[in-house]
Amino acid sequence: MASLMEVRDMLALQGRMEAKQLSARLQTPQPLIDAMLERMEAMGKVVRISETSEGCLSGSCKSCPEGKAACRQEWWALR
């Protein structure tokens, strides 16, 4: 189980990471990492960076069951 300080240190070393990357690196369940990141965001320690992939050439996102959410990446970085 990782602490808030370990999450902060990992972000400091890596620059920016996705929650699933943090979860794998720290060997901590992703729901716990998500909760920690949201708490750190509320404290003003980290910032959420959302990127939408504009490279969907086929336009199949409309028919995809996951929709545009599958093309969206969410990164976390220290403030």
From Swiss-Prot:
Protein's name in the database: Probable [Fe-S]-dependent transcriptional repressor
Gene Ontology MF term list: DNA binding; iron ion binding; iron-sulfur cluster binding
Alphabetized UniProt keyword annotations: DNA-binding, Iron, Iron-sulfur, Metal-binding, Repressor, Transcription, Transcription regulation
Functional description taken from the UniProt entry: May function as a transcriptional regulator that controls feoABC expression.
Source species: Klebsiella pneumoniae subsp. pneumoniae (strain ATCC 700721 / MGH 78578)
Record family assignment: Belongs to the FeoC family.
UniProt: iron-sulfur cluster binding residues: 56, 61, 64, 71
Family annotation (Pfam families): FeoC (PF09012)
InterPro entries (alphabetical): FeoC (IPR023732), Tscrpt_reg_HTH_FeoC (IPR015102), WH-like_DNA-bd_sf (IPR036388), WH_DNA-bd_sf (IPR036390)
Keyword Iron-sulfur belongs to the record: yes
